[in-house]
Amino acid sequence: MSRQVVRSSKFRHVFGQPAKADQCYEDVRVSQTTWDSGFCAVNPKFVALICEASGGGAFLVLPLGKTGRVDKNAPTVCGHTAPVLDIAWCPHNDNVIASGSEDCTVMVWEIPDGGLVLPLREPVVTLEGHTKRVGIVAWHPTAQNVLLSAGCDNVIMVWDVGTGAAVLTLGPEVHPDTIYSVDWSRDGGLICTSCRDKRVRIIEPRKCTVVAEKDRPHEGTRPVRAVFVSEGKILTTGFSRMSERQVALWGTKHLEEPLSLQELDTSSGVLLPFFDPDTNIVYLCGKGDSSIRYFEITSEAPFLHYLSMFSSKESQRGMGYMPKRGLEVNKCEIARFYKLHERRCEPIAMTVPRKSDLFQEDLYPPTAGPDPALTAEEWLGGRDAGPLLISLKDGYVPPKSRELRVNRGLDTGRRRAAPEASGTPSSDAVSRLEEEMRKLQATVQELQKRLDRLEETVQAK
């Protein structure tokens, strides 16, 4: 009798653990807008989520440790005039976040350490160029201040946030229909896109050339998502002709046939893939699902190995994914998701069971740090570079906020004041606060005089 051989993997027993109630973010009004993005973005300092707003678009930004019930009057980022569709934290500055909206603009915001105390209406810079709603924003992984946006005008624009200028444009001749997803390669030299015309494309954005493309990676008519994974491969999620959800792995040099194709179920939600390059694990989260599936990618056939599935009772309206430097390494946490319910945001930790409390070097190889490897000018000049790596052995402490400087020719002073590295406010911010205090004091004095006159009138009668 033959014996079944079980593949050996240190990630076979990874399990998901939802946070306790007091570690969740309660009473948040998650956006009801229909759009296939995660609606949530997190980093080691903040959690941001797109929320319902009357008369425009807004998203909520909370310090990571500020859990519990969120006040209904909590300040939001509310500068857009139409619903926000996508948000993304800058990988090189944990205080900077970009947002794309139905108002056809991209806005870049600077969040002070400690979070917002007043509504934030003025962005650091507004990026205008799209003619229809902007549904995707994605920062370059290694070049400073390089931001990509994709709109329903079938245009991809690459911006230098430091100047507020569009430096590259991929027009409708590249994507003749709605763009479903865009993902940067690890060194930022390529992007892969999925489009409503049922094609997945690999593009060199600086040359505006399509390096490779695959027609109908999935036979179904519903949206396809595509991301770069290990060794330059691409992973796609989509639907079969019979509306079964699928996940497929492709070699970028040979897109004729998939390296692996697996059918999952018959649910209708689009699967959002999240890839961890340190562990080669990809997590699939479906909007409207109540589960997270995860697979390990290897360099040998069959390449894509199912590991397990985390399930819960309530379905998810969106999902955020924490960068590796924001995890608790002393608990063997290899991933953390932020699941959006209708009125709640729930952290879910993915953990490898280990008995030792010591640092597990095999689980935590050097990972991408917060410093950029290139300037925007170097990348535009043709250079590529992988991320600058850091060790998590001694833990990670987020640095103080760094001011985002925008130079727009004569408009060099247009930027929000932020705390400097020393933690003290800038002189401009102090001057503005002092002026506001003087105005408030004058108003109080005037009101007091009116009250005194009113009392005298009443007493005279």
Swiss-Prot record:
WD repeat placement = 13-63, 73-110, 123-160, 164-204, 207-251, 258-296, 302-349
Q: Which UniProt keywords apply?
A: Acetylation, Actin-binding, Coiled coil, Cytoplasm, Cytoplasmic vesicle, Cytoskeleton, Membrane, Phosphoprotein, Repeat, Ubl conjugation, WD repeat
Q: How is it modified after translation?
A: phosphorylation at Thr-412 by PKC strongly down-regulates the association with actin. Polyubiquitinated by RNF128 with 'Lys-48'-linked chains, leading to proteasomal degradation.
InterPro entries xref list = Coronin, DUF1899, Trimer_CC, WD40/YVTN_repeat-like_dom_sf, WD40_repeat_CS, WD40_repeat_dom_sf, WD40_rpt
Locate the Phosphothreonine modifications and list their residues. Answer: T412
Q: Name one GO biological process term.
A: cell migration
Chain intervals with Basic and acidic residues compositional bias = 403-418
| Residues recorded with modification N-acetylserine | S2
- Which segments does the entry list as coiled coil? 425-461
User: Which SUPFAM superfamilies does the annotation name?
Assistant: WD40 repeat-like
Phosphoserine, modified sites: S2, S422
Homology family: Belongs to the WD repeat coronin family.
| Subunit organization | Binds actin.
Q: Provide the protein name.
A: Coronin-1A
Q: Which organism is it from?
A: Macaca fascicularis
